[in-house]
Every structure is written in structure tokens, then in C-alpha cells.
């Protein structure tokens, strides 16, 4: 049975994990790191770079490097590169494809199934977009799981039978969630969740960037926001400074040649940022985490003292101010240090993949919907059918009627949110139920059913009880991708995968050819410069020279077939040269004469075979 992986598709970094012998293992990427930057870059030569290679070239390729695309999931955001439009799903799919490739290389087998995590506070459109990204990457998404739930699953499975209440405080690169879960006897049940989809480590970075821009403007009078390359360098320096301030009281930010003045003289940025100043300029961001925490405690109907364990998730929770705030909010409770905040979500996703594949037994995951769902009714009111923090999957029905006499149809507008007025919430989608027989208002019976699946994706049905006529919508309005568009993107991604494979193959062929040219050229040079002259005729060496010249010409072009052909010819000429040298050496030994020479010649029968075999093997290797 094919194995399934667990993927934490993060705003700044992503992680993939898999079960090995029942235990979750985080898979290192092809660069050797356990986390992969969620960055995609389109190089000017047509190559698509993902992860660390994309991050490495960001400064010199600002306009064609995309990061933090998770913040655009479920919106109509897109970016145009070389005349082609890319959606957030397609960019995310590139990251997923890299994680998939790295996991396949680690396991030595193809992977098609995956569990992908999302922030608990992601709405329906964002979840749908994440699932579409998985499909474009060639993955069968078994389940979309909330990140805090996955973290609790990873943390809580080995904690015995005793029922425990766990608070998961998840502050990632672009999103924030806080969730309260109960774990016991193999059941992980989410009691309540809240959060902010537009709050994360990126915002802390931005504050440092703004601080640096203001400082530089104050000393030089130059506004760096107008220089894209300078801003990219500032962002990278800000992220580094933020990380350093988690373990140091101050950090130096030194960027030479950040820009030039009016006289084209180079200018340098050199600032000292203290932890106290950093906390001062980001205090309001930290305060935004307080209300979701209070909401979760209230929604779950418990007191802070009932919390048994606090689990921190996301790299941003390493900031001392965040840890201190969590301690303050939980009445001094020390957060658990036994989990890696960067990896715990992917580990939980791998465990859930194991549950769905039957590899992990006796575990039940009960997740919740983060926001209320309902429809707009007379007066623009939001009538909720499913309240927030309802355990999913779930199904709820309610009967409505018409607002006007002889109304032939009803418009069903589906919203997600907590506001009393429908328009103030997130419109997920709308559809029409037609063919209602003429009748006074209030007479027709229209049954509206909301069905949320285990991925948190919503299906809505409206049915006229009188005629039995019904209409259904699967909410995907937020992502706006039709099945045809998704199929096209899948094909496009597959085509790019083939392009990437060809490019890697071409690079390998070029490397082999360049290596062979270098080694053969050196060998010929050594022969010509040997003491007593070359052991082989100049004619033989000239043939090798010609083959080297042909190979160099081929390497100067882009025709890989020509390079392969030239490399093959050079290999043959090299082999002929090796054979000629061997024969010349044998002839010299024979001419040496005398008993020693004869003995040497006479005792070399089996040795000849061995030496000959070694020469042939060496030549084959050089091909």
C-alpha cells in the first residue's frame, strides 16, 4: 500500500513528515534541511526555483520571487511572470511539488496521498484553495487538518489514558491561531478555536524594516522604500535580527552599499536594535493575540486553571515576548519544551495520514469549524445554521419560506462569520432555487441544509418541500477555480515537472562532458610534456585533440544530443589513446631484453588480463 505523507504548508517555511515503522519522521529536503522556505522564484533562464535556492537569489530577482503566498490563499490574487498569470494555488503547488519530490527521494517510492494542514481560522475559501494546490501538485489530499489539532495529535498521543486539556498557541509566519483541545483514550477533540489570519512573524519583520527605513531616512534623507533591491535586503536583515533578538539583548544590522547618494557615493546602513526597542515597536501586534485567547477560554466554558499543558507552535513563538505573554495569559504555566515548534504540525499531519491509511489504530480526531455558517434572510440578517466550534463533519437543516407573494425563486446567499448583519461577514457563494409554484408569501417550505465534510469544506442544498425540486452548491467561490482550470494547472505543473527533469538531466550531461574534456585534455598535455616525449604517435594525439575541440564546440551550444554524441566520440578516442599507450609500454618492456625482461614478459599472462580489464573499466567510467 502506497504511503501517505503529512505536510505543513507554512507561510514562511514548510515541512513534510512520514511514518516509518509507526513513528513519524521529518524528511530532510534535497538541500539537507528539515524545513523548506515557502518561496518560489522564476529565474530569467526559465528555471523555476523553490525553497532555499529561491531564497538565495531573492535580492537580485525581487520582482520574480514570490514569498508568503499563503496569505493570499482563497482570494483572487495572482501574479504575472513573462506574460503568464499564476494564482496563489499554483505558487503553493510548486512548494508542495518540491516537498513531494524530496519525500519520494527519501522513501524511494512514488507518493500520491497527503494530509495537508491549514490554520484553524482558515475560512472555507482558503481551505478549498489549499486542497486545489495539492491537486495541482499531483497529490490526492486525504484530509485538510487544522494546524493546532495536528500539533496536539503529535504532542498528546503518548501521554497515556488520562484526559487532559491542552492549549495550542500557534503563531506562524503569516497566521495566528489559539485552540483548546481535550485528549484522552485515543480521542483528540477540539473544544474551541479562534485566531487572526493576518497576523504572523512577517508582521514583526515589517516593523523592523519600517524602523530601519525611518532611521536611514533620518540620517541620509533617502527613502529606501523606492528601491526594491534595498527593501529585499532590509527584509532579510530584519528576519535575521528578529531571530537573533530571541537569544540576545541586542543585534547589529549592518548593510554595506545599501544605496548611493545624489553624487553616486555608496551609503551604508549600520544600526543597533535592542530587544527592548524591538518589543516596543511590536507591542500592538502582540496585544492582538490576547482577544482570541480570551474567546477560546469563553467558548470552551472553562477557566484558565483547567489547562493542563500549553504547546507552542510556529517559529514566531520563540520570541521571548510571546513566551512571556503566554505565561501571563495562562496564569504562569510554563509552555511545553518537548516539541519542536517548526516540525510538530507536520508530525501530527503524518500521524493523521497514518490514521486514514490504517497504520495508526485507535485514534479519533474530532475537529471543529472555526466560524459560524449561515444564510442571508429578510432584512439582510445573518441566520446561522451551524455555530462556530461545532464538531465536524456535521449536517444541519432549517426550513425557510418566501418573503413575497407568488415568488418564483429564492436566492440562497451563504456567509461565514460572527456578525449579525450578513453583509459584514464573508460571502462564500450564492445560488438560486427556481420553479417555486405561485403561492402567498410564507406558504412555500424551503429546506436549507448545510453539510460540512471532514476537511471543513461546505456543501449547501436548498429544497422545495412542495415540489421536491432542489439545488446544491459546493462552496468554492473564494478560490474561483473551476474543475477545468484546476485540470489545466495540473497539466501545466506536470509539464513543468518534465521540464525540470530534463533540465537536471541536461545539467548532468554537461557536467560529465566538461569533466571528460578536462581530464582528457590534461592527459594529452602530460603525454606531450613527458620526459623522452610521448609514447604514442602525434597522429593519435591529434585525433584526441579534434575530439576535444568537437566536445567544446558542442558544450558551447544548447543541443544536448550533440553534447552526448561528442562525449561518446571523445570517450572512444580516449580509449584508443589508452590502448596505444598500453601497447607502447608493453613493447618497451619486451625490448628491454635479458632474463629479467623475459621473466617479466613470461609471467604476465594473467596480469595482462587484470591490467587490461582495469583500463577498460576506467575508460567506461570516464564516459
UniProtKB/Swiss-Prot annotation:
<comment type="similarity">
    <text>Belongs to the heat shock protein 70 family.</text>
</comment>
<dbReference type="InterPro" id="IPR018181">
    <property type="entry name" value="Heat_shock_70_CS"/>
</dbReference>
<dbReference type="InterPro" id="IPR013126">
    <property type="entry name" value="Hsp_70_fam"/>
</dbReference>
<keyword id="KW-0067">ATP-binding</keyword>
<dbReference type="InterPro" id="IPR029048">
    <property type="entry name" value="HSP70_C_sf"/>
</dbReference>
<dbReference type="InterPro" id="IPR029047">
    <property type="entry name" value="HSP70_peptide-bd_sf"/>
</dbReference>
<keyword id="KW-0597">Phosphoprotein</keyword>
<feature type="compositionally biased region" description="Acidic residues">
    <location>
        <begin position="609"/>
        <end position="623"/>
    </location>
</feature>
<dbReference type="GO" id="GO:0051082">
    <property type="term" value="F:unfolded protein binding"/>
</dbReference>
<feature type="modified residue" description="Phosphothreonine; by autocatalysis">
    <location>
        <position position="175"/>
    </location>
</feature>
<comment type="function">
    <text>Acts as a chaperone.</text>
</comment>
<keyword id="KW-0346">Stress response</keyword>
<dbReference type="InterPro" id="IPR043129">
    <property type="entry name" value="ATPase_NBD"/>
</dbReference>
<protein>
    <recommendedName>
        <fullName>Chaperone protein DnaK</fullName>
    </recommendedName>
</protein>
<keyword id="KW-0143">Chaperone</keyword>
<feature type="compositionally biased region" description="Gly residues">
    <location>
        <begin position="594"/>
        <end position="605"/>
    </location>
</feature>
<feature type="region of interest" description="Disordered">
    <location>
        <begin position="587"/>
        <end position="623"/>
    </location>
</feature>
<keyword id="KW-0547">Nucleotide-binding</keyword>
<dbReference type="GO" id="GO:0005524">
    <property type="term" value="F:ATP binding"/>
</dbReference>
<dbReference type="InterPro" id="IPR012725">
    <property type="entry name" value="Chaperone_DnaK"/>
</dbReference>
<dbReference type="Pfam" id="PF00012">
    <property type="entry name" value="HSP70"/>
</dbReference>
<dbReference type="GO" id="GO:0140662">
    <property type="term" value="F:ATP-dependent protein folding chaperone"/>
</dbReference>
Amino acid at each position: 500500500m502506497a504511503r501517505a505523507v503529512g505536510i505543513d504548508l507554512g507561510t514562511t517555511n514548510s515541512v513534510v513528515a512520514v511514518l516509518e515503522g509507526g513513528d513519524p519522521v521529518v524528511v530532510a529536503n534535497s538541500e539537507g534541511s528539515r524545513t523548506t522556505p515557502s518561496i518560489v522564484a522564476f529565474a530569467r533562464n526559465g528555471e523555476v526555483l523553490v525553497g532555499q535556492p529561491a531564497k538565495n537569489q531573492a535580492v537580485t530577482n525581487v520582482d520574480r520571487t514570490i514569498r508568503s503566498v499563503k496569505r493570499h490563499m482563497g482570494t483572487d490574487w495572482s501574479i504575472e511572470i513573462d506574460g503568464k498569470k499564476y494564482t496563489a494555488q499554483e505558487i503553493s503547488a510548486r512548494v508542495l511539488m518540491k516537498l513531494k519530490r524530496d519525500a519520494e527521494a527519501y522513501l524511494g517510492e512514488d507518493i500520491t496521498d497527503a494530509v495537508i494542514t491549514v490554520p484553524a481560522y482558515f475560512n472555507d475559501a482558503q481551505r478549498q484553495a489549499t486542497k486545489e494546490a495539492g491537486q495541482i501538485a499531483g497529490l490526492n489530499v486525504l484530509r485538510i487538518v487544522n494546524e493546532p489539532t495536528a500539533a496536539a495529535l503529535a504532542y498528546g498521543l503518548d501521554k497515556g489514558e488520562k484526559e487532559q486539556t491542552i492549549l495550542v498557541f500557534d503563531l506562524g509566519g503569516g497566521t495566528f491561531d489559539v485552540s483548546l483541545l481535550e485528549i484522552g483514550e485515543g480521542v483528540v477533540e477540539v473544544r474551541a478555536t479562534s485566531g487572526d489570519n493576518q497576523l504572523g512573524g512577517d508582521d514583526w519583520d515589517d516593523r523592523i524594516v519600517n524602523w530601519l527605513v525611518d532611521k536611514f531616512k533620518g540620517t541620509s534623507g533617502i527613502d529606501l522604500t523606492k528601491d526594491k533591491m534595498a527593501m529585499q535586503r532590509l527584509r532579510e536583515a530584519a528576519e535575521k535580527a528578529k531571530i537573533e533578538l530571541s537569544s540576545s539583548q541586542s543585534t547589529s544590522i549592518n548593510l554595506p552599499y545599501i544605496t548611493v547618494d545624489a553624487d553616486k557615493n555608496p551609503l551604508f546602513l549600520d544600526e543597533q536594535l535592542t530587544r527592548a526597542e524591538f518589543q516596543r515597536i511590536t507591542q500592538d501586534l502582540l496585544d492582538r493575540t490576547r482577544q482570541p485567547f480570551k474567546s477560546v477560554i469563553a467558548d470552551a466554558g472553562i477557566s484558565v486553571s483547567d489547562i493542563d499543558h500549553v504547546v507552542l507552535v510556529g517559529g514566531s513563538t520563540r520570541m521571548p515576548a510571546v513566551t512571556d505573554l503566554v505565561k501571563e495569559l495562562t496564569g504562569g504555566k510554563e509552555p511545553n519544551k518537548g516539541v519542536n515548534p517548526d516540525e510538530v504540525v507536520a508530525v501530527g499531519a503524518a500521524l493523521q495520514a497514518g490514521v486514514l491509511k490504517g497504520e495508526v489504530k485507535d485514534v479519533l480526531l474530532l475537529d471543529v469549524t472555526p466560524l459560524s455558517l449561515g444564510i442571508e434572510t429578510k432584512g439582510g440578517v445573518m441566520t446561522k445554521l451551524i455555530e462556530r466550534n461545532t464538531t465536524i463533519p456535521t449536517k444541519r437543516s432549517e426550513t425557510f419560506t418566501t418573503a413575497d407573494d407568488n415568488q418564483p425563486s429564492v436566492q440562497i446567499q451563504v456567509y461565514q462569520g460572527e456578525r449579525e448583519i450578513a453583509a459584514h461577514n464573508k460571502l462564500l457563494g450564492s445560488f438560486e432555487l427556481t420553479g417555486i409554484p405561485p403561492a402567498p408569501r410564507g406558504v412555500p417550505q424551503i429546506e436549507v441544509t448545510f453539510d460540512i465534510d471532514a476537511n471543513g469544506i461546505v456543501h449547501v442544498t436548498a429544497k422545495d418541500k412542495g415540489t421536491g425540486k432542489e439545488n446544491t452548491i459546493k462552496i468554492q467561490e473564494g478560490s474561483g477555480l473551476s474543475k477545468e482550470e484546476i485540470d489545466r494547472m495540473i497539466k501545466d505543473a506536470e509539464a513543468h515537472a518534465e521540464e525540470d527533469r530534463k533540465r537536471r538531466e541536461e545539467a548532468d550531461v554537461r557536467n560529465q562532458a566538461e569533466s571528460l574534456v578536462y581530464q582528457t585534455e590534461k592527459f594529452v598535455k602530460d603525454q606531450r610534456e613527458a620526459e623522452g616525449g610521448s609514447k604514442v604517435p602525434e597522429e593519435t594525439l591529434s585525433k584526441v585533440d579534434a575530439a576535444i575541440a568537437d566536445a567544446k564546440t558542442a558544450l558551447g551550444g544548447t543541443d544536448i544530443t550533440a553534447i552526448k554524441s561528442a562525449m561518446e566520440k571523445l570517450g572512444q578516442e580516449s580509449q584508443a589513446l589508452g590502448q596505444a599507450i598500453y601497447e607502447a609500454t608493453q613493447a618497451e618492456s619486451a625490448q628491454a631484453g635479458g632474463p629479467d625482461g623475459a621473466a617479466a614478459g613470461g609471467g604476465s599472462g594473467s596480469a595482462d588480463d587484470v591490467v587490461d580489464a582495469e583500463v577498460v573499466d576506467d575508460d567506461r567510467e570516464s564516459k
